[in-house]
Structures are given as C-alpha cells and as structure tokens.
Amino acid sequence: MAPSLSPIRSHHVAVIGAGAAGLVAARELRREGHSVVVFERQKQVGGTWIYTDHIEPDPLSVDPTRSVVHSSVYGSLRTNLPRECMGYRDFPFVIRSDVSESRDPRRFPSHGEVLAYLQDFAKEFAIEEMIRFDTAVVKVAPAAEEGSGKWRIESTEKEKKVLRDEIYDAVVVCNGHYIEPRHAEIPGISSWPGKEMHSHNYRIPEPFRDQVVVLIGNSASADDISRDIARVAKEVHVACRSNAADTYIERPGYSNLWMHSMIESVHEDGSVVFQNGKTISVDVIMHCTGYKYHFPFLETNGNVTVDDNRVGPLYKDVFSPAFAPWLSFVGIPWKVVPFPMFELQSKWIAGVLSGRIPLPSKEDMMMEIKTLYSTLDAQGIAKRYTHQMGISQFEYNSWLASQCGCSETEEWRKEMYFATGVKKRAHPETYRDEWDDHHLVSQAYQDFSLYT
C-alpha cells in the first residue's frame, strides 16, 4: 500500500519512555510535524541499557509493594548482535571520531557502549528537549469528554510529588518489557529452603562464590550468566524445558557447568531433582525466564489486555483497533534486530497520525488479528509466543517499509543477523570476538558512508 496524498495533520503526541524505542519514536513523530512530549521516569535516556548496581529488595521481584529497579543489565553483558547490525538505519552504530577514547570499540560491545550510542542519538537529534525526566506516568486513559481520540495522562515528577493532568491527541507506548519478571513453576518450591531469585536482580558473580547454583532458562541471559557465575561457583546447572528429558551434558570448556532437562521437583532437604533423574543439593535457583509485558498505567476498559504475555488485540503489533490510530506501541516484537524495527514502526505511526498513511478499518484490522490468532492456535503455538518473530521479522520490516515509502532492510544486515546466529550456536564462547563476515562489514560501511 503506497502512502496517500492526504493533507498532513499535526497532533499533540505523548511518548511513554525514553529508551531505544521512545527516542526514535520521538524523532520520527517530530520529523512528521507532530508536537511531542516524552515521559521518562529515570534521569537520563537509555531505558533498559542504563546499568545500576542496585537490585530490588525482593530477589524474585514478586512483591507488588517493592521498590522497582528499572534495569535488568548485568555487569558483564555484551550485545549478542554486532554493532553494525544493531544501529538505527540512518545513525550507524560505529566508533565515532568525536567521542572519548574510553568507549568500547568491540563489534559486540558492552552495555555501556550501547547506552552511549543512545545518548549520542538523543544529542544528535536534539531529542532531550522533548523529554520530561524523572517523571512517572501513573495513568493513561481515554478522555471521552474531551472529544473522540483524546487521551488523559496523569504523571508525577520525582521531587515535586504533584499529580499533573494533561490531554493529548495520541499516545505511543515505548516502556519496554524487561522489568516485570516471569517465573518458572517448580513443584515443591514453597518448602525448599534455598534462595530463589530472578536474573533481573543479577549483577556480578561474586555473591555466588563456592555455591551450587541452578539457572532456569535457555535465553541469552541464562547462557551469559551461567558462564559468568561458573568462574567462581562450585557448580552451575542449567535447566531448560526445551531440552530432552534425558539431557545431561557437561558444557565444553568447563568442569563445573552442566546442561539439564527441566527441574522435576525440589525438596525440604535442599535437593533439586531433574527430569533426567539427577539429584543435587542446591544453594540458589535463579530464574532466567524472561519478562512480562506490563502497562500498569494503561486503562483501556479491557480493549488492550495482556494474556499469557500476548498483548492484544494489536494490528501488526502496533495499533489497538479500538483506539487506532490514537494508541500505539513500539517495541512489542521480540527475537528481532530491535533498533531498526523500532525505527520503521515509528515512521509508520508518525505517518498514520498525520494522515499521510491510511489504516484499514477497525473491522478489517480485527479480522486480520483473529486470523493470526487462529493460525497460531492451529500450529500449537502458545499465546506467549505471539510476538516472537525470528526469521519473519524481515518480511514484517518489508511490509512496514512499503507502508512508509522507505527502503527495505539492507541485505547485508539480514545476512549478518543470520550469520551471527549460526556462529553463536556453533561457538557460543567465542562468537563475539572471532568472526569471518568481513565482506558484510565492508558492505555495511559503504552504506554508512551516506550518513557519517
């Protein structure tokens, strides 16, 4: 569908969050001519990439009254995609000649380098002038009394503690999904005497010195943290429900790190029994089981819900048909190259709001969503995987690009993504520091020369 030639309309738009999604959303909205206010509860840009030593007092992060820490970054974290692949399309993630030499030049850099990149992006495009820092959004709800499509936002500034009530034409939700942890269900856990925690509260390995630790999960964090802890722990065991029931493998290169099938049960004597029949005495169980989508501020009278981590109904993972185009989300899909996708989603939202890009009718959007849900059900795919994309992300990106009238994802970026996945599976210990895709890097830098 080609962009229409309708007159451009400007709207007053609120963006919730100043992480990687919120920053590019703000830029694209302003480029399209909209008036933008970004709400950010922290004192700087960067969202989930802001590292802090602080952890929550509740190691499982289940206490609703807890003081929430808005970062899940651990000290040793490095990207699992190369920087060339990660960056926004017109602001390459390259070593910049005009910044400090203390920056991390590696292709798979630290979390600090990603944060610095986002700060550079915000500075380059003067985004901070649109941001209200230290401001928490406590309520987003339709403001029917103000006219169709209007939204009421209530927010509080950290120091003032005064509720601010404002009306906006549209809201773009960019608050991320790495704050509210998911947990595995473990038979017998209520009487197990050891320590339970979620990886949200992991920072450094030292607290686990000489301990026996079980991690649950097969995510990038489980992989990274298990190897991190193995440097100091007595034993590390990784349990994963996707592993065959008889799985028991010593991790190559380690004498104290094993892969298992899922936990079968835990007991009062401190033991953990795996589906493979192995029983060990354990000090700590760490849930590396991901996060829930969480929008505690959003009131939609049931029109947008989170059901087993399916956010919906959403058209193309972005627009709520009930409120389109006045309520949208950036950054819902996972297992993707995030920043370039955020950029395309933001361009689409900005163009739709201005009237330049048409949306289908509410009925047609709902029909497509119902068809998607039926297809997933027929394939036996659980609701919690609704937003997992993987290989399908590039078809999705192509569709977004066609709506926006911009170029599709570069071939080198696609190839780099797939090559990195192959390398990671074959060489999980070394893929970040040994690579053979120099021809793709060369192609990337040819493209980057247009912007740097």
UniProtKB/Swiss-Prot annotation:
Its cofactor is FAD. Belongs to the FMO family. FAD binds at residues 17-22. NADP(+) binds at residues 217-222. It holds the Pfam family FMO-like. It comes from the Eukaryota. GO terms for cellular component: plant-type vacuole. Catalyzes the conversion of methylthioalkyl glucosinolates of any chain length into methylsulfinylalkyl glucosinolates. This is Flavin-containing monooxygenase FMO GS-OX-like 4. Coiled coil: none annotated. Keywords: FAD, Flavoprotein, Monooxygenase, NADP, Oxidoreductase. One of its GO terms (molecular function) is NADP binding. Its EC number is 1.8.-.-. It is an enzyme of class 1 (oxidoreductase).
